[in-house]
Amino acid sequence: MVQAEIQHHARISATEPIAAGKPKFLGNIYSTAQLSDFKRYWNQVAPENAGKWGSVEATRDVMSWSSLDAAYKLAKDNNFPFRMHVLVWGNQQPSWIENLPAAEQLQEIREWFAAVAERYPDIDHLEVVNEPISDPPRKVNSADQGSGNYIGALGGSGTTGWDWVLTSFRLAREYFPKSKLIVNEYNLTSSTPRTQQYVGLINLLKAENLIDLVGIQGHYFSTRNVPAATILSNLNLIAATNLPVYITEFDIDDRGLNQTPANRTQADQYQLGEYKRIFPIFWEHPSVQGVTLWGFRPGMWRTDQGAMLVNTDGSERPALAWLREYVSATVTSLHNEMQPSFTLYPNPVTNGRVRIEGTDKIKWIRILDVQGKQLQVHEVAHQSFHSLELPLAPGVYLIQLSDGRTSFTKRLLVP
């Protein structure tokens, strides 16, 4: 599932959003720097900073809604899904709440929830808590500004270890009964222990029917140099919760860590290669129902790292041109749609041979290494099974089956 075969269509629209007509959205953030040509590319909206409590109510009881109003209007005027980012977080929170008594803090949190609910009655996806593992609303020291310092008002760790998150979601269910509730976190695709911790929290929320969606941020610092098999494995752990998954804050730099590209061509090709390696893992996964990029124009938060997809003159970088073509050409399935079932045996491989059952609808079988490099390709011609000779060094590989539209991937162990 590292990269699907792209079929060239005779015509790919350059005037409507990239994912128009697709079962999954491909969205982006609302900010002044990202507005130009937004509707030409994207069909979902999340405010970058406008929905953070510290942006709206920097001064107690003085509300600044204008930017959040504009983000919401952009979504609703164009029938794009709107994700509210974010109610509870340990960053960019009002400084005035930090030293209030806990009971008063809780009352202010309720007022914040109520104000958002009243002003924006049709929020599609409500990000209740952002970064519960990484950045809870706890003041660590005097230099920790913007944390909110209200974790205790929400119950602290409590008996579950996550009482404050559970309270946040209970309040969200109360004030936003029509919205889908989502939690969000980063550095999941690169860390299985962290992913398992996140799944534990999700299961606590599921036990009270408090959560509808799961967010994975997808920033490049969590996918750079991470094997495709690791990304997919951790994504599958989260998908096993049987909740829809959203990639909430996706970006890819045009350089490796602490590396400066020699020239624009090198930068473009690096970013393009990483988009081809990483994006299909998420886009083709049947549990992933949408991807939100965290900016695409100069002025986005990772401009210095070269993550923008559009140049300063407005021209598209190669990764953006590829993204439009790829999404247009790739037919994806969602979790509740019928998917082909295939089995591998023996797995681990014995004597360099493996048999694949259930290939009657399959056109191609590819063997990839864990970095996504294609090692073998086999045409199946709709046979019910296929046997392969695998003269491969010991290790973990990916075996990818494609019906010409969608690909399906499993891990294969060669001892």
Predicted regions and their residues:
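Substrate-binding cleft and catalytic face of glycoside hydrolase catalytic domains
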Residues: 33, 40-58, 66-188, 252-258
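Aromatic-rich peripheral "rim/lid" segments of glycoside hydrolase catalytic domains that contact
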Residues: 10-16, 57, 115, 127, ...
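Glycoside hydrolase catalytic-domain groove-lining segments
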Residues: 66-78, 158-184, 195-260, 279-284, ...
